[in-house]
C-alpha cells in the first residue's frame, strides 16, 4: 500500500514514517522542510520525499497513492496566532483542497490529524466526547481544525473514507523533538536545569498521549473497517489519560532523579483546563489501537534520548525544539516570506 504522508519531517511525522516503513508500507513524504534540519539523533532518510508546500500539491503527486495521512500544517495555538489568516489558509483551506484532490484522484482513505483544541474552555466535571460535547474553538488553530473537519467529512462516501483523529497533547522522543508541549517541556527542564517551576497551582487538567500511540491511532485509520472509521472523529488518548499539571510535573520529576519541583502558584489557577473521553477509540478500535505508553515509560525514554543525543539547555530553549522560534528565524533570515513561502532552497 502506498501512503502519502504530509508533515513527514515534523515531530510526529518523523516517528510515523519509520513505523510505516517498518510495517511494509511504501511512504511518500510531503513536507515544506521548515524543520528538516532541526534534528536530534538520526531520522530515517531512505524513502521518497517531496519538498513542497501542501498548498501546492497537484494530481501527479498523488499518482498511485492509496491513502493519505495528513499531518502537515501550523502545529499549535502559538503558531496559529502568528498569522490567523495563514493558519486558515494552510490548516483549513489547504486541508480541504488536498482532500478534494485526493478524492478526484482515486485515493481511498484520507486520515486527518485534527485537534482537541476545538473544544475550547470547558467545564471539567464531564469528559469531552467527540460528537456530543460543544465545540467552542477560541484560537485560529482550533477554528481551522474544526472547520476543516466539517468540510472534509462532507466529502466522504463509500469510495472515499475520511477519518479525523484528535490527539491529546503529545509527548515522547522524536528525531525532531518539540519542547513547546507540556510533558516534553517539563522533562527537558528537569534534565537541563535540575528543577521544574510550575507557575500555576497545578490543578488544571491536561490529556496527554505518547507519540507512538498517536502513530498507532493513525495506522488504525488505515486498517480498520470503513464501517467503523468513515466520516467519524476519534479522541486519541489512553485509559485514564487525563492528568493534572501537578501529576505531569511529578512524573517529570520522577523521570529525572534529583531534580527539584517547585509550585510557585503566582498565576493562580489556569483557565485552560479540560478532560477528554477516550471511550470511542478504546472500545470501537480496540482490535487496531492498543496504546502502550504511560508517563513514566515516556519520561524514561526522553531522558535516555537526551543522554544519547547530548541534549542541553540550548536545544531545550532554542529553535531546535521550539517551533515558533524556528519559524521566526526563517523569516528573519529571509528563508521564507511573510506568507510562509520559501525564498531559498537553503532551508
Regions of interest found by a model, annotated:
Residues 43-56:
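Rossmann-fold cofactor-recognition segment
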Amino acid at each position: 500500500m502506498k501512503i502519502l504522508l504530509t508533515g513527514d519531517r515534523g515531530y510526529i511525522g518523523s516517528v510515523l514514517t519509520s513505523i510505516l516503513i517498518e510495517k511494509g508500507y511504501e511512504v511518500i513524504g510531503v513536507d515544506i522542510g521548515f524543520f528538516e534540519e532541526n534534528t536530534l539523533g538520526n531520522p530515517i532518510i531512505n524513502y521518497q520525499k517531496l519538498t513542497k508546500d501542501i498548498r501546492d500539491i497537484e494530481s501527479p503527486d498523488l499518482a498511485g497513492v492509496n491513502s493519505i495521512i495528513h499531518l502537515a500544517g501550523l502545529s499549535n495555538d502559538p503558531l496559529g496566532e502568528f498569522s490567523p489568516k495563514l493558519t486558515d489558509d494552510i490548516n483549513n483551506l489547504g486541508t480541504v483542497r488536498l482532500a478534494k484532490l485526493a478524492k478526484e484522484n482515486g485515493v481511498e482513505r484520507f486520515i486527518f490529524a485534527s485537534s482537541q483544541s476545538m473544544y475550547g474552555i470547558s467545564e471539567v466535571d464531564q469528559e469531552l466526547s467527540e460528537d456530543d460535547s460543544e465545540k467552542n474553538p477560541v484560537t485560529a488553530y482550533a477554528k481551522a481544525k474544526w472547520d476543516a473537519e466539517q468540510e472534509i467529512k462532507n466529502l466522504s462516501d463509500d469510495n472515499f473514507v475520511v477519518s479525523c483523529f484528535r490527539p491529546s497533547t503529545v509527548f515522547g522522543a522524536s528525531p525532531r523533538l518539540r519542547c513547546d508541549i507540556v510533558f516534553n517541556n517539563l522533562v527537558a527542564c528537569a534534565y537541563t536545569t535540575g528543577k521544574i517551576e510550575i507557575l500555576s497551582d497545578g490543578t488544571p487538567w491536561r490529556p496527554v498521549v505518547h507519540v507512538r500511540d498517536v502513530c498507532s491511532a493513525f495506522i488504525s485509520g488505515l486498517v480498520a473497517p470503513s464501517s467503523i472509521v468513515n466520516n467519524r472523529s476519534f479522541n486519541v488518548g489512553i485509559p485514564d489519560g487525563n492528568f493534572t499539571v501537578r501529576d505531569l510535573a511529578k512524573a517529570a520529576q520522577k523521570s529525572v532523579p534529583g531534580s527539584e519541583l517547585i509550585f510557585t502558584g503566582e498565576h493562580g489557577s489556569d483557565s485552560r483546563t479540560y478532560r477528554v473521553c477516550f471511550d470511542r477509540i478504546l472500545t470501537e478500535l480496540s482490535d487496531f489501537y492498543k496504546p502502550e505508553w504511560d508517563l513514566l515509560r515516556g519520561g524514561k525514554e526522553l531522558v535516555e534520548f537526551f543522554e544519547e543525543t547530548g541534549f542541553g539547555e540550548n536545544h531545550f530553549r532554542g529553535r531546535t525544539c521550539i517551533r515558533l522560534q524556528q519559524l521566526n528565524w526563517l523569516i528573519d533570515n529571509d528563508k521564507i516570506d511573510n506568507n510562509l513561502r520559501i525564498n531559498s532552497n537553503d532551508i
